[in-house]
Design a protein with these regions (language model features):
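A residue-level marker of the well-folded mature domains of exported/periplasmic proteins
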Residues: 1-172
């Protein structure tokens, strides 16, 4: 994986941890961009002996929702997936004034085998923007890879950090 982004960093971390701790590891890439295709790869990993599955990206929320109770012996680490993201999957429309559960007998929950990890991308973005201006760059722009919440938070932080440094230095 060489996308120089979240996927690559996650994969490199999994490899490093597994190698340092004598663990086996494998990479499974969904064939497409649907929950069904992500779940199929999760199930393939489990059938091949995976005990811990690391999933990078908010798009895995529904996959966690679908797999967490079905595979209680497997640990799921969902990066950039909040508990609210997973719990929202229990509803037909989580944003409705009175959300209706898909299954009235299944209340929203995060199973003990799930760890949701979210980052404060805006803080890293702030530091990047601040450092750019402090290093003398005063004509800046920000282009994120995709218009997704994590990238938007980073971009917002970048702008705020650049503005703060420019204010300190009296630079426009």
């Amino acid at each position: 994986i060489t996308d120089q982004s979240f996927n690559q960093t996650t994969w490199e971390a999994v490899q490093a941890y597994a190698q340092e701790n004598g663990k086996t590891y494998a990479y499974y890439k969904p064939a497409g961009d649907s929950t069904a295709e992500r779940v199929a790869k999760i199930e393939q990993a489990i059938s091949q002996g995976a005990k811990v599955i690391v999933m990078p990206g908010f798009a895995f929320a529904e996959s966690v929702y679908e797999c967490q109770d079905e595979y209680p012996e497997v640990k799921f680490i969902a990066l950039d997936v909040s508990q609210a993201d997973v719990e929202g999957c229990f509803y037909v429309d989580p944003y409705a004034p009175e959300p209706e559960l898909i299954d009235p007998n299944n209340e929203p929950h995060i199973s003990p085998n799930v760890v949701c990890v979210v980052f404060q991308e805006e803080e890293a973005g702030y530091l990047a923007g601040y450092a750019a201006v402090k290093d003398g760059y005063t004509r800046l722009g920000f282009c994120g890879g995709m218009a997704v919440p994590a990238v938007q938070r980073f971009g917002s932080g970048f702008i705020q950090g650049a503005d703060a440094a420019a204010s300190e230095m009296n630079v426009e």
